[in-house]
């Protein structure tokens, strides 16, 4: 029905004032966007001066109507809704009744406003249409930046700044132009952003492995659970360093995305670590020797809260062991020269290290000031 390999090659159509009869009444929808004849986006418009929240309530009422088109017709394929009164424009994902409610207390599923890459809001319907609704842009939003949480039967939409961050990482990797960091404020959904970046890299045949690296065991478990919430069976638990090494050397597609702690990774790579020394004493191949064939592979490392544990020997070990790797960091509080406190000693010269020193360039920023 739909070309999912190249969404831009599908046929896009616009239908105005679509009318559908229900069991008890009829409903008329202002604008419907179709992909290959399948309704994908519904737009409800209000006149200037009337709150677009009236349109939101109207959609909720439509969905509550017995025998409504969202359950008995092709409207069940609608992915997202857009509401506007011309100067204010919002959009939100289609969901089942459990996650779809709106009342005077604003008990509502997440509502979004579009924004430019510099985070400036795009609210006027004309500007919104120019930015959000071009055929390829809309198809990309639906195909790449909406996440179905199957266990909760809930659809999530990535916010604009999350999309820009993922696209910046993706472009940096496609152009193979070094490392970078994402500065997104605490609580802005970095786990979802990093999940999407990691899983899109899984589709890139030029990348051998993608590792999402955290600095504490509890974050390892928490991140793994979140990744698997977004996509069931996305990552497996690495109970110890040996399990991590097995997945690193595995050619199984399921092991292409790995969540681990920086401590496990450091123990595996450092030939002077206790584990590697003990294996050598027993005549067993060390972890670092097992991983040696990966040294010429294109690897991607994404570090969570990269301001915490990226200063030190482990970071240098990773960069030295994987010379073709690209490293990306997520942080809510980057280290700048004015707040740098950790000194890096190289060639007997001590200097303060910043986030930019380690990750080269800021790829995207979203801060609340």
PLM region spans:
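ATP-dependent helicase/translocase motor core
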Residues: 1-209, 218-234, 252-257, 263, ...
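Signature of the SF2 helicase/ATPase Hel1-core->accessory helical subdomain module
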Residues: 52-55, 263-369
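Structural beta-sheet core signal
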Residues: 81-83, 212-213, 301, 329
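Conserved helicase motor
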Residues: 217, 238-247, 262-267
